[in-house]
Amino acid sequence: MQRSFDDLGTPLSDVTFVVLDLETTGGSPSACAITEIGALKFKGGQCLGTFQTLVNPGVRLPREIVYLTGITEAMVGPAPLIEAVLPTFVEFIGDAVIVGHNVRFDLGFLRENLKRLGYRPLTNRFVDTCSLARRLVRDEVPNCKLSTLARHFRTSADPCHRAFDDAAATGEVFHSLLERATGLGVLALDDLIALPTTAAHPQVAKLRWVASLPRKPGVYLFRDGAGRVLYVGKASDLRRRVRSYFSSDDRRKIGPLLREAQSLDHIVCVNDLEAVSYTHLTLPTKRIV
């Protein structure tokens, strides 16, 4: 029977992403201000729109920020204040998944300004390209700075501490990392968001097993190279449960099972009670977990 998208999770090709970058007067969201916003909206690899504006921070720019970004007092002086920019930018983001390099920095400034101006907080899901890169290409690059990754993936956009250019470079890096992730069986949004922890597992190549599992109750069976059952488990959400094996910190117990396992089978059940009954039908020859 063909599974629905709800069973598998939202396919990445159906997800709208907004890749963003902010320039600011410093590192503290509560004490510093936004000077520039740049963002691009993508779905299915296609750019749907862009957002770009300077922002008058309402304070003098620190000398080191002018030197770093090239943004000057003359540039931000005639620019709109953040209270004039933020409503339009929030509308641009909509319910998209937010992507950024060290994205928590950008989200911190957005949340602080939304709170100060009396807007509802952002509840969007987000993906950090820095965390993804640490898991997917850490052996290929000396570090995971945006400039390093841009050179590694030969992006056409050059990150230069200007918001739109950095957002464009981040978007190209993100799509290159997506290609790596799909090679591990990451085809749905939940799996992508979980990847920074699951990809650290030494048996990460077997993570592609997760892609075939529905989000339904059932039984899963780890098998060795000869097809013998190593372990039978039940789950209310097969996909989430098996994926958790790759992010578990208890490597002493989980590690031996994943090292020996060479395949994974599953049986979809109507509910948890039916799943319990199935676990008694096929007993493991070796109960590792």
Residue ranges and their predicted role:
Residues 127-143:
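Short alpha-helix plus adjacent loop in nuclease-associated cores
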Residues 95-98, 227-230, 264:
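Short active-site oxyanion
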Residues 1-123, 139-161:
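Conserved non-catalytic scaffold segment of RNase H-like nuclease domains
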Residues 162-173:
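Acidic, divalent-metal-coordinating active-site segment for phosphoryl/phosphodiester hydrolysis
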Residues 1-9, 152, 175-226:
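Acidic two-metal-ion nuclease catalytic site recognized across multiple nuclease folds
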Residues 24-26, 105, 131, 169, ...:
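Short, glycine/acidic-enriched loop or turn micro-motifs at the edges of active sites
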Residues 279-285:
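Conserved small/polar residues in nucleotide/adenosyl-binding loops
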Residues 220-252:
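GIY-YIG-like beta-to-alpha core
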